[in-house]
C-alpha cells in the first residue's frame, strides 16, 4: 500500500503517481497494490475539462493504475466536490487486499464513503 495526499488536481503532483516514478521509488511494490490519496484528490469539478470525466487527470491516472494493475482509492478531503462524488455509482468491493463500499470514478479509481468502514 502506498499513501499520499493533497493532489488538488495538480499536474505537478500527479507525476508522483506516474508508474516510472513509483517504480524508481518502490520497485515492484507499487504493482498489484492500493494507492491511497488521503484527502483532496481534486477530481470531478464541474466545467473543468482537466479534472472532470473524460478529462486528462482521470484518464491519465486510470491508465497508470491499469499499467500497475493497482487501485487508487481517494479519501475525500475538505476540498472535494461532494455533490459529484455522491452522484457516482456505489459499489461494494471485496478484493484480496481491501473491502468496503466505494463510489466508482473508473475501474481503477474509487472514492471512499464518508464514515465508511474499510478493511485493508
Spans of model-derived segments:
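Core catalytic region of metal-dependent phosphoesterases/phosphodiesterases
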Residues: 4, 10-118
Amino acid at each position: 500500500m502506498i499513501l499520499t495526499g493533497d493532489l488538488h488536481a495538480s499536474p505537478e503532483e500527479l507525476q508522483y503517481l506516474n508508474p516510472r516514478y513509483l517504480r524508481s521509488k518502490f520497485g515492484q511494490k507499487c504493482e498489484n497494490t492500493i494507492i491511497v490519496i488521503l484527502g483532496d484528490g481534486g477530481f470531478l469539478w464541474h466545467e473543468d475539462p482537466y479534472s472532470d470525466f473524460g478529462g486528462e487527470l482521470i484518464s491519465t491516472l486510470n491508465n497508470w493504475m491499469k499499467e500497475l494493475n493497482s487501485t487508487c482509492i481517494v479519501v475525500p478531503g475538505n476540498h472535494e466536490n461532494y455533490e459529484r462524488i455522491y452522484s457516482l455509482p456505489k459499489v461494494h468491493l471485496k478484493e484480496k487486499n481491501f473491502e468496503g463500499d466505494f463510489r466508482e470514478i473508473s475501474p481503477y479509481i474509487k472514492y471512499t464513503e464518508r464514515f465508511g468502514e474499510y478493511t485493508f
